[in-house]
From Swiss-Prot:
Keywords: LIM domain, Metal-binding, Repeat, SH3 domain, Zinc. Residues 266-327 form the SH3 domain. This is LIM and SH3 domain protein F42H10.3. One of its GO terms (cellular component) is cell junction. Residues 242-260 have a biased composition (Low complexity). CDD domains: LIM_LASP (cd09447), SH3_Nebulin_family_C (cd11789).
Amino acid sequence: MSKKCAREDCGKTVYPVEELKCLDKVWHKQCFKCTVCGMTLNMKNYKGYDKRPYCDPHYPKTVASVMADTPEMRRIAENTKNQSNIKYHAEYEKMKGTKIEIADDPEMERLKKNTQVQSNVSYHGVLDQKARQEEVRPKEEISPNPTPTPISPMNHQSYSAPTQAVAANTHLIYSTEQGGAVSPTPQKSIGSIADYDPMNGQWGTAAAQPRNSEKLGYLKAQVDKGPARFCADFAGAPPPSSNSISSTSPHSTLSSPQSTISPTGKAGFAVKAIYDYAAADKDEISFLEGDIIVNCEKIDDGWMTGTVQRTLQWGMLPANYVQPHKLPTGLHRLS
């Protein structure tokens, strides 16, 4: 059976030499033309629509049709939405408990950073190291505060026999304003390496020590009370008798003011200035390098009182500006 050409106005037999198979039909090569304009086409530039060949300009364009929003269409859309929600919720229930998705925000970033810092502190043992440092830290010395014992006036006969109460409490000074014993050791505070003073080996410089003028009220009153003041070397030389004083200066009389016992149990010691110091307060004294300061009394770890031999001024001075000095044995008249 011979094959016929698919073109309607041709209808002739198609031989194998001129045969063209396309769109499920057999065509003559010269009969394979555009249905609208009649332009000859080939296998590269044709477009088929409804099993008919078309060129590109005349190819029927598919345009989306506009459908009215009817109740039926609304019902279909609602069903589609419900089906989508059901499927999504089923997936959500399936994934529940397996993982949690959390969005990163500043608060979460801060918590993650804090957790990382805590983990590093625990891993490196910072807390244990601080605890060990606190264990080896020297404990503060807290002097006991017994019942204050008033000091009776002393004369030259009873000077060599101090009372047992004063000898037992060698680290106490007495203040008439506070009515009893006052501990000279202040509360130590933890400082930095910049506050360490290498001269006295204590924490805190001389300028940083608390100045308590009330502690000096009784000492200054006793020194300024008598018309003549004497100091002995810190070796503990006994005070002179009244006869020797009257023979040296017949017009001067030795009164018997209340004596102040130093924390070391002696009548004062002498020091020598190794630096210049300018008084920063009214209860301090100024001195130059090389000055001899006598009749010294220790107030606390950083301060003491004494009299400068050169200027005869009495007051407070920093302990890290002086060093112990040995005076010749004997009596030295200051005023």
